[in-house]
Regions:
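Short acidic, gly/pro-rich beta-turn/loop elements at beta-sheet edges
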Residues: 44, 133, 157
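FNR/FR-type flavoprotein reductase catalytic core
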Residues: 1-130
Length: 167
């Protein structure tokens, strides 16, 4: 499969192990694309690693910031604008997203518009979990408890809930 990883802000942190998994098992995957966005260049996580990954021949790294500062020469705009700019086959891609809810919602929709099916898009519903056993209800997302049932879900399992604000 091709692999597309899309992170927004601190959402890159939980995706980092997946990035290293793909890099350490490159022979098991075809095209590998990382799409990452942050508010500003100063808020980019793992800047040194982003630079190293971007220099690799076996992956594509596309980075965007919402607001450019002096000296920034990269892309400006929301990370979802990067969808479609990397080499991957929408019919064969597995996609992993983590970031703010709105980014995941619009990111998934952009990927769907490119032909990726909802059962191949995985979202990491990182929530502030307290008890980790589903007792307190703090991480309840509709009928789902993120701590017990996730935090990673196929998009087709949560797409209706992710559309609702404040769920």
């Amino acid at each position: 499969h091709d692999v597309v990883i899309m992170g927004g802000g601190i959402g890159l942190a939980p995706l980092r192990p997946a990035i290293y998994h793909v890099l350490n098992n490159r022979d098991r995957y075809k095209d590998f694309v990382l799409l990452y966005g942050a508010r500003s260049p100063q808020e980019l996580l793992y800047a040194q690693e982003l630079q190293e990954w971007g220099g690799r021949f076996d992956m594509t790294v596309l980075v965007s910031v919402d607001v450019a500062t002096r000296g920034w020469t990269g892309s400006v705009g929301v990370v979802t604008k990067l969808v479609g700019r990397g080499p991957y086959d929408a019919d064969d891609a597995l996609v992993f997203l983590c970031g703010p809810g709105i980014m995941m919602r619009y990111g998934a929709q952009s990927l769907i518009d490119q032909g990726v099916t909802t059962d191949r898009i995985y979202v990491s519903m990182e929530r502030n979990m307290k008890c980790a056993v589903g007792f307190c209800g703090h991480c309840q997302f509709g009928p789902t408890f993120i701590c017990k049932d996730g935090p990673v879900f196929r998009f087709d399992e949560v797409d209706k809930l992710i559309q609702v604000r404040e769920v």
